[in-house]
């Protein structure tokens, strides 16, 4: 007799081996139809896999995020089969699930979006056929023989440990895969091809160029329709287009992947950093600055020279190797070592807006989201073990304040100890419990990623959610046991002995360039008044009032507003239209009446106009709005 324990504690008995699918049908036929896979004693497997001993099961359904990932994995196989049906000489490589869909890298002649209709037609045939996904196992030798005509697959197989290797069949199509998969191709309800691009095999420019075919899939057509609508909205908000339209930044081939910020872009940049500095000063941080280029010996000590050199820009100066920093951390360690520290000095909270450079292949560069030169808002907190919980909680509270100012929601993920680590069991236990206790005290829900921490410490990843519901991983709170050891950091304890400090490395904006790109799309270029590059523009109706227009601009600039003026020989309607296209929050029209009365006609971005506003009344409304960083439009 086999006892199967369900999530609610109920036990289902079976006379012999039973599949997860049969157990699900025992609950109800309707429930079984919505099941995608099953966890048996924590191990994810196909519904068809026999359960041969007593076990606890958890069913993965179409309503679970994990269920969607499994179905998209199966969709990648469906797409791959369609490609081979249409292009028999194509060679499949890898096809992982990614955020919002999947892709498959294929060695084949170039294709374009013009080929998508016939590929999707073939895909739909495979879906309608409801072909079962069948898992089979081979020895390593058998797998190598099976794929002897596909050098990409044999390369992957050769790197696997000896033992059984799984493949999945759907009709006459077979692919190398760990699984699991949905029961049959019919559960891939809607599959749409999204785009195609070139990609080097394993990201190596010396290896063959492949066709990377992207797709997405959902359990019903409504979800697909909503997703496509979201993509259309995202296109309108594309920060690359808005960056040009709003005159914020540009890129030039003379410095690929390194943004040039224009005057308006720098106003936005400075407003963002002024807020960062204000909040960090209140939270007890000092601001530091370290050199952009440092000697090879530092990078050897930090481990970057050995592990990260291919991503670093290096130079030979007077027979010494130097590298432009890809990270701010090692410089922060040197700063700590410039003084002797007592336990009474701790915690030390030191932040840096540091410019870093990382070599990225030209093919992966993408606006402000993926660049070669960017600034990180790194901070290092040095403390005793007893301070971990309070310091983590302090960072979480700072994160809450700052993200909420931008109207960004977020969720937290705690990543715990992986298999290979440095540090003792006791250090890891104290560190992890400190992070966990701080998360519990914060009152926010969080997800645990078991074994997903770095080798040098557990971490908290912070994923923000923008106005379109997209998530972005920006902030990180990383407990680091590696660099304090490598740089021999110490403090003198109450016992008058030297001790190793605990160090937290954290970022909130992350890459500031990337964060700006996210904000541009989050706000669709319509920044709140406090953040807007230009907060108000004076629009002169004619040359006769140019003097008054300049006087208004000067008075408002003196009060601290970021101002522009439009004295062009254009109609007032064109000036208003241009200001609206530039998404300037406040448009101040001045003509003969306004000059005579010493007033303004104030137009807001929502099209409302208020006449007869004095400059003092204008400032009484606007300044508190800016000082409190109010996200709403000003009401006059």
UniProtKB/Swiss-Prot annotation:
Taxonomy, superkingdom: Bacteria
UniProt-annotated location(s): Cytoplasm
Region of interest called Catalytic, as start-end residue ranges on this chain: 238-528
PROSITE patterns linked: AA_TRNA_LIGASE_II (PS50862), TGS (PS51880)
Catalytic activity annotation: tRNA(Thr) + L-threonine + ATP = L-threonyl-tRNA(Thr) + AMP + diphosphate + H(+)
Residue stretches making up the TGS domain: 1-61
GO molecular function, one term: ATP binding
Pfam families documented for this protein: HGTP_anticodon (PF03129), TGS (PF02824), tRNA-synt_2b (PF00587), tRNA_SAD (PF07973)
CDD domains documented for this protein: TGS_ThrRS, ThrRS_anticodon, ThrRS_core
Cofactor: Zn(2+)
Any one cellular-component term (Gene Ontology): cytoplasm
SUPFAM superfamilies recorded: Class II aaRS ABD-related, Class II aaRS and biotin synthetases, TGS-like, ThrRS/AlaRS common domain
UniProt GO BP: threonyl-tRNA aminoacylation
EC number: 6.1.1.3
InterPro entries: aa-tRNA-synt_IIb, aa-tRNA-synth_II, aa-tRNA-synth_II/BPL/LPL, Anticodon-bd, Anticodon-bd_dom_sf, Beta-grasp_dom_sf, TGS, TGS-like
Cofactor binding notes: Binds 1 zinc ion per subunit.
Family indicated by similarity: Belongs to the class-II aminoacyl-tRNA synthetase family.
Name recorded for this polypeptide: Threonine--tRNA ligase
High-level lineage: Bacteria, Pseudomonadati, Thermodesulfobacteriota, Desulfobacteria, Desulfobacterales
């Amino acid at each position: 007799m086999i006892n199967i324990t369900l999530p609610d504690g109920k036990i289902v008995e079976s006379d012999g081996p039973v599949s997860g699918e049969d157990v699900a049908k025992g609950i109800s036929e309707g429930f079984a139809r919505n099941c995608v896979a099953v966890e048996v004693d924590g191990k994810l497997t196909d519904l068809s896999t026999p359960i041969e001993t007593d076990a606890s099961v958890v069913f993965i359904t179409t309503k679970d995020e994990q269920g969607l990932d499994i179905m998209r994995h199966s969709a990648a196989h469906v797409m791959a089969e369609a490609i081979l049906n249409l292009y028999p000489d194509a060679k499949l490589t890898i096809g992982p699930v990614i955020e919002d869909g999947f892709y498959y890298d294929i060695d084949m002649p170039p294709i374009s979006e013009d080929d998508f209709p016939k590929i999707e037609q073939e895909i739909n045939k495979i879906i309608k056929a409801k072909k079962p996904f069948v898992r089979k196992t081979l020895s390593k030798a058998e797998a190598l023989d099976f794929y002897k005509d596909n050098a990409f697959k044999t390369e992957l197989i050769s790197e696997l440990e000896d033992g059984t290797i799984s493949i999945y069949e759907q009709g006459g199509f077979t692919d190398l895969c760990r699984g699991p998969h949905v029961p049959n191709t019919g559960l891939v309800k809607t599959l749409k091809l999204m785009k195609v691009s070139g990609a080097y095999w394993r990201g190596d420019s010396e290896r063959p160029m492949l066709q990377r075919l992207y797709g997405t899939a959902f359990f019903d057509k409504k979800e697909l329709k909503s997703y496509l609508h979201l993509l259309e909205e995202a296109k309108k908000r594309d920060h690359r287009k808005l960056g040009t339209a709003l005159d914020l930044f540009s890129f030039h081939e003379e410095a690929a992947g390194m943004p040039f910020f224009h005057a308006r872009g720098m106003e936005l940049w400075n407003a963002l950093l002024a807020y960062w500095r204000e909040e960090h000063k209140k939270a007890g941080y000092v601001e530091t600055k370290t050199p952009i280029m440092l000697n090879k010996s530092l990078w050897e000590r930090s481990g970057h020279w050995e592990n990260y050199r291919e991503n670093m820009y290096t130079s030979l100066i007077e027979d010494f190797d130097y590298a432009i920093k890809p990270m701010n951390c090692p410089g922060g360690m040197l700063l700590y070592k410039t003084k002797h520290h007592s336990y009474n000095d701790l915690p030390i909270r030191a932040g840096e807006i540091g410019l870093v450079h990382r070599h990225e292949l030209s093919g992966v560069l993408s606006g402000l989201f993926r660049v070669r030169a960017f600034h990180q808002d790194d901070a290092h907190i040095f403390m005793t073990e007893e301070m971990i919980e309070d310091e983590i909680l302090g960072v979480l509270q700072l994160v809450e304040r700052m993200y909420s100012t931008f109207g960004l929601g977020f969720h937290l993920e705690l990543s715990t100890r992986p298999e290979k680590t440095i540090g003792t069991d006791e250090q890891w236990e104290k560190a992890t419990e400190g992070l966990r206790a701080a998360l519990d005290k914060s009152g926010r829900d969080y997800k645990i990623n078991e074994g997903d921490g770095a080798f040098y410490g557990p971490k908290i990843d912070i994923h923000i959610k923008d106005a379109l519901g997209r998530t972005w991983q920006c902030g990180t709170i990383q407990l680091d046991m590696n660099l304090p050891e490598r740089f021999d950091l110490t403090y003198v304890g109450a016992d008058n002995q030297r001790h190793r400090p605990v160090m937290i490395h954290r970022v909130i904006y992350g890459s500031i360039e990337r964060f700006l790109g996210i904000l541009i799309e989050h706000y669709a270029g319509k920044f709140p008044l406090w953040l807007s590059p230009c907060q108000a523009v004076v629009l002169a109706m004619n040359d006769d009032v140019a003097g008054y227009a300049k006087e208004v601009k000067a008075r408002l600039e003196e009060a601290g507003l970021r101002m522009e003026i439009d004295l062009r020989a254009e109609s007032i309607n064109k000036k208003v239209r241009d200001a609206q296209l530039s998404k300037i929050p406040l448009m101040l029209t001045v003509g003969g009446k306004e000059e005579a009365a010493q007033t303004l006609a104030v137009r807001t971005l929502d099209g409302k106009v208020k006449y007869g506003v004095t400059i003092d009344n204008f400032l009484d409304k606007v300044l508190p709005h800016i000082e409190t960083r109010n996200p709403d439009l000003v009401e006059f």
